[in-house]
Amino acid sequence: MVMDLFQMIAIFFLYFLANPIFYLWLILLYFLSKKRVKEERISFHTRVFRRLADYTIPFLPGLLTGVFLSIVTIGLGLIISWEWITVIVVLYVFFALTLQVQWLTPTYVLGFLLLFYGLEPLLGSMEYVAPIYAELGNIPLVIVATILVLFMIAEGFLIRYHGATYSSPRLERSKRGKWVGLHVAKRIWLVPVVFFIPEGMIPTITHWPVFSVGDVTLQPVFIPFLIGFTQRVRGSIPRMPIQAMGSRVIGLGLLLSLFAIGSYYIPVLAVVLGGLAIVFRELLSYQAKIHEGKQPIFFSTQTKGCIILGVLPNSPAAKMNLEIGETIVKVNGQEVNTETGFYEALQINSAFCKLEVLNHDGEIRFAQGALYDGEHHQLGVLLVKGDVVLQDSIT
């Protein structure tokens, strides 16, 4: 009995690992992490986070989200088929080829699929398309609409509570040619969810769980989904606008759930839901981009103090609990407002430093710590660099 249980769990996860979406996730994160580290080195001559962080940071939130979604899908008894899963895999690969991370979500994948359902009167008679519609027709539109809405709400929660976690700091030139800082939040969460498929579609073992619903016998399987997200922030600390985006996505998901419920009675509403999901999700991203462009740049050089653009993990700055968006006003009693001045003030005492920091509430706090050989020359604090003005040597 115990061995059968272990075999069941092993097979359960083997089917999960056999899904191409899992390997698509690994491949995409490989290239995303490589590009991120390259851009961080261009900005700061050092990486901020290890490449492995792109895998580890989203892993647990995605897993926990999958657990909560699975409770709902099991409770609703959502039934899909392997043919339907195959179409989802193909759509994920298609959207991955666009290189747009934010499109790698069920909002776009299932939204596109629902629109494809709606085109059946036009495309259903075509020789190569008819078999696809024949297989997709086995899955009611209301199920696809329900899955889309559930994942959109889950996407909103992931963005709100985990979207800004370890966002990547960068430097770029402003329109006036000055160096400014920004943060790039780019995540792909892997969300494994339990669905039901008709028994016999996959091989099982003696004690594999099966459920009978009328004349149909069902078996559960783990199916991985991807939820991608990207947002650039220049006008504030990254947490605020990203949390706002998450709240808007949750609200959109709740609003569209009315269409999902209505599609139980009027199936065509599911097709309308697919189109609205794509359009309004794009509008949310566009609105955030426009709003961000109108904001004054938050991470820039200023007359008083050095604003913290980033903090290297496990650095003296991290141990002193310095946070992104705080302003270092004094270093070892010396007022600073440039990266060069900050470094020079640190040299006053090479073994110890004391900082006066203006926190997010506008209050001064003190931070101090010992310095050791081999540590980052700027405590592990990433600042916006200023342009060096060279003196004319000709007199």
Language-model features, listed with the residues they occupy:
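N-terminal signal-anchor module of multipass membrane proteins
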Residues: 1-73
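Interdomain regulatory linker/hinge segments that flank or connect interaction modules
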Residues: 208, 228-290
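Structural signature of hydrophobic alpha-helical transmembrane segments
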Residues: 17-32, 73-89, 140-149, 212-222
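Membrane-cytosol interface motif
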Residues: 296-320, 326
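Membrane-helix interface "capping/anchor" motifs
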Residues: 96-109, 232-244
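Conserved PDZ fold ligand-binding element
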Residues: 317-339
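Generic multipass alpha-helical transmembrane bundles of integral membrane proteins
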Residues: 116-238
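PDZ-domain C-terminal substructure recognizer with occasional recognition of PDZ-binding tails
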Residues: 343-387
